[in-house]
C-alpha cells in the first residue's frame, strides 16, 4: 500500500475503530451493572494447612496471611468474606487479620465481627471490600455446649455501575459438629435477613454439603429465596474430608456467571471465587 492508498484507507479504519469502541461501551452507556466478583475463605486462624495456630509464631502467621494477600491481588474480587479470622488473639500475634489483608491487598473497607471474645481470644467472621460498606452488623449465634460460638457479619454495598442498587453481603460460619445446631443458627440468620429487601449474597463455611439428610442449604433456599452453583456437583472445598463445605448463595435476582475453587493452599479449606450478574429488578 502506497502513501496515497494509505491516506484513503485511514478514514475507514477510524470509522471501524470508533464503532468498536461504541460497541464495547454499550453496556456502560446503557447503565447495565458490571459483574460483581466475590471470594470466600475460612482463614483457619492464619495457620495455613498447619496442625494448630498454637504451634506457630506471629511471623509465620503473617507469612501465611501474605499468601492470601497474593491471591487477593491475583483474583481481584470486589468483596471477600472470611471465617475463623482473628481480631486480637494471643495465639497468632494480637493484631487484626482482616485489617492486615485489606491494607496490603488495597481494599479500603473492612469489617470484622468477634463471635468469640474472651480468654485472650477475639475472632469470628469478616468482610473486606473495594465497594463502600454501610449498615455493618455482627451477630453471634447461641453458644453450643463445649465448643466455640459461631456467627456472621452482614453489610450493605452498592452494586458496581448499577442504578443505585444496594446488595446485602454476608460472611457466615455455622457449627461444625451438629446438624440441629446448624439449623438453629440458620434460623437466626434467616430472621435477620428476611425483612431486608435488598438482593443478597451469603458466603461462608456452612459446615454442610448438599442433599440427603443435610437440610441446611435447602432451608436457606426456601426461606430466603437463594440458590447456588450446581448444588449436586461433586465439588470439594475441604480436602481433608473431601466435602463441599464452603458456599456462595445468591438471591433470585442475581445470577452466578462463573464459579471456581482455587487450588492455592491458604488453609485447610479452599477459597471459592464467583462472578455474579445482577438481573433486572
Regions flagged by a language model, labelled:
Residues 41-43, 85, 172-174, 205-206:
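Active-site metal-binding loops of divalent metal-dependent hydrolases
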Residues 14-20:
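Sec-dependent signal peptide recognition
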Residues 156-159, 180, 184-187, 191-201, ...:
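Metal-dependent phosphoester-hydrolase catalytic domains
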Residues 35, 85-166, 260-263:
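Structured beta-strand-rich core segments of catalytic domains in phosphoester-bond hydrolases
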Residues 40, 79-81, 111-112, 168-171, ...:
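Structural recognition of the beta-strand scaffold that forms the well-ordered cores
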Residues 28-104, 117, 187, 279-281:
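N-terminal, active-site-proximal structural segment of metallo-dependent hydrolase catalytic domains
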Amino acid at each position: 500500500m502506497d502513501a496515497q492508498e494509505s491516506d484513503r484507507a485511514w478514514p475507514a479504519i477510524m470509522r471501524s475503530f470508533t464503532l468498536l469502541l461504541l460497541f464495547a461501551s454499550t453496556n456502560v452507556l446503557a447503565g447495565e451493572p458490571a459483574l460483581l466478583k466475590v471470594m470466600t475463605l475460612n482463614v483457619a486462624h492464619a495457620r495455613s494447612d498447619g496442625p494448630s495456630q498454637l504451634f506457630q509464631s506471629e511471623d509465620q502467621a503473617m507469612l501465611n496471611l501474605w499468601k492470601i494477600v497474593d491471591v487477593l491481588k491475583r483474583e481481584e474480587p470486589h468483596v471477600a468474606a472470611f471465617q475463623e479470622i482473628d481480631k486480637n488473639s494471643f495465639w497468632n500475634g494480637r493484631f487484626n487479620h482482616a485489617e492486615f489483608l485489606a491494607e496490603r491487598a488495597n481494599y479500603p473497607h473492612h469489617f470484622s465481627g468477634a463471635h468469640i471474645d474472651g480468654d485472650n481470644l477475639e475472632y469470628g467472621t469478616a468482610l473486606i471490600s473495594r465497594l463502600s460498606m454501610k449498615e455493618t452488623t455482627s451477630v453471634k449465634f447461641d453458644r453450643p455446649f463445649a465448643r466455640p460460638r459461631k456467627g456472621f457479619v452482614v453489610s450493605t454495598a452498592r452494586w458496581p455501575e448499577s442504578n443505585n442498587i444496594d446488595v446485602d453481603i454476608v460472611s457466615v460460619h455455622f457449627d461444625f459438629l451438629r446438624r440441629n445446631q446448624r439449623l438453629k443458627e440458620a434460623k437466626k440468620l434467616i430472621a435477620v435477613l428476611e425483612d431486608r429487601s435488598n438482593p443478597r449474597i451469603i458466603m461462608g463455611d456452612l459446615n454442610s454439603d448438599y442433599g440427603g439428610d443435610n437440610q441446611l442449604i435447602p432451608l436457606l433456599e426456601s426461606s430466603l429465596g437463594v440458590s447456588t452453583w450446581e448444588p449436586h456437583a461433586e465439588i470439594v472445598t475441604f480436602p481433608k474430608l473431601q466435602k463441599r463445605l464452603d458456599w456462595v448463595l445468591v438471591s433470585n435476582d442475581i445470577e452466578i456467571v462463573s464459579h471456581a475453587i482455587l487450588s492455592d493452599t491458604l488453609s485447610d479449606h479452599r477459597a471459592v471465587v464467583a462472578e455474579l450478574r445482577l438481573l433486572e429488578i
